[in-house]
Amino acid sequence: TFIAQDGPKADNIREILKNIKMPAGFKIELYALVPDARDMAMAPQGTALFVGTRKDKVWVVSDRDRDGVADEVKDFAPSLEFDVPNGVQFSKAGFLYVAERNHVRMFPAAEFFFEGPDVVAVDIVPKGELIPEGEESYNHTARVVDIGPDNKLYISLGQPYNVAPPEKLELYNQTGIGGIIRMDRDGSNREVFTYGVRNSVGQDFHPVTGELWWTDNQVDGMGDDIPPGELNRQTKAGQNFGHPWFGGGKTRTNEYKGVTPPDGIVHPAVETTAHCADLGMAFYTGDQFPGKYKNAIFSAQHGSWNRTEPCGARVMVTYIDDKGNAKMEPFAEGWLNENKEYDGRPMSITMMKDGSMLVSDDYAGAIYKISYVGS
């Protein structure tokens, strides 16, 4: 399956991008049309971008001449079945990891073999063994996968409820549902790294400290302005970030308000506007953008669906000082138009070899490229 890259849809998106507001000196353009585009992974040579979805496809966006514009978009490994293959990540050596709803696979040298229909796939976590099959859900099963400074895999496992019920907590703590798990890259030595997560769909390691930072989507139905969304900083293994005792930030959930939370709950580094849906994120490690952006976090707010006054649909930037204090502000906005309708919903962020930034949008079915061109 090939996706046409020109026509009315591309023209329409280019018109929308004229309304996106960013700091002076930045430009945004359409990089590729990619249906349902979610998490992204740039291959080490920079000639192919792999894009996950919440459907049944992984897409490959190729730029063979490396001119910064997509040449072709096709489905990856069409002979294989994928089930919510949201999470994609490359190792430095070119191994592609794909985290599905209940399966994790590795594809050696995917950058060089994606042209053919048949590719080598290695089970890292066999199908049905990432979570108990009885816990499979469409809700909160979009995984992200990362490789840590320790060379291990880190995989988010959202819990499927609005608020996790008490009778599930023991199972979830054992399996890492409502948390982040880590394992060796062959799938061995699995352990729970993070507890007390509701549904995280964005994570990255600080390029200097190696600490894991991650976003979390918080409880619905408590009101327009509570609880806040979260950007979290994890300083050691085993920390608990408060779900289900806390709905977001320090706001207690109705279901657990009479229950004493565990000791040592870690509260977020940044509380974000309620229901804006903070999803994918990445640290900026390139040299193209002005110096103040070095090692800052760029993150995508997907936009609300259950708020009287819609919010989100923008790219945020978070500056972190030497003590780990974080300050977040809007960087690119305008996908929520003046009629309060969504013209797009940014979902995830990744960086290109030249220091440009790519932003995926599963609502528009597009990937945008943001670069700094100077004043």
Per-region residue spans from a language model:
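Conserved beta-propeller blade signature
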Residues: 48-52, 95-98, 152-156, 211-215, ...
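Blade-loop segments of beta-propeller domains
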Residues: 38, 60-94
